[in-house]
Amino acid sequence: LFRSTAMVWDVVGPVCESGDWLGRERALAVRPGDLLAVLSAGAYCMSMASNYNTRGRAAEVLVDGAQATVIRQRESAADQMRLETLLP
C-alpha cells in the first residue's frame, strides 16, 4: 500500500517497555518495507547498548553525503551465545 500523503504514527522501539518511544505523533509518508533513520538514538547507539530482553545490538551505519557504509555489523544470536557456558 503506497501512501503519497503523510499519516500520523507513534514510533516505538523493539522492547516491551512503556518508555521505549522514539517519536510520538509523527507525520510520516511511509509504506511497508520502508526504513526509518533514527538520529541521536541515545540508548540505541553502541556506547549505551545492552542485550536487554536478548535483543541483539544494532548495526551502525556511517553516512557521508550520499555514501552509506556499515561500520559495525548487527549482533547475531550466535554472537550473544558465544560467551555462554552450558553446564553439564
Model-inferred region functions:
Residues F2-P88:
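Charged (often Lys/Glu-rich) extended helix/loop segments that serve as interaction or gating elements
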